[in-house]
């Protein structure tokens, strides 16, 4: 991500409720969108990079201090990976979602979100798995909306 937002440092202590969610085994908020178009990994990565500019918690990782405090920080954050899985049947996304839901988040390295594209040339499913520490259902709906805007119009300006 090469933007002016990289320059700004963001840090705040994780709240008690957020800390509770960090230890909850099933704290993933999920959205699945069926896209009736050809979406490439490059197109999706570009859209993810753009939505990171608008959604601050997509630019943070969680660091654990010596005294056991958890903090959100924008320093040393790795890129959000986009996973692509070939789509063979229209129900493949169900199994991919189930497997993706079991995978642990790498809180110390990158934002607690995953994007999985179950890809075909005519129709694909985009699975977004986000830890409840950085999103809820409504914020994930807004994020998905913004992602679709940038998938549909890669040249669209980012509204901050």
Residue ranges and their predicted role:
Residues 1-13, 19, 134-142, 146-160:
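Non-catalytic, low-complexity flexible loops and terminal extensions
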Residues 45-138, 142-145, 149-152:
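Acyl-thioester-dependent condensation/acyltransferase catalytic cores
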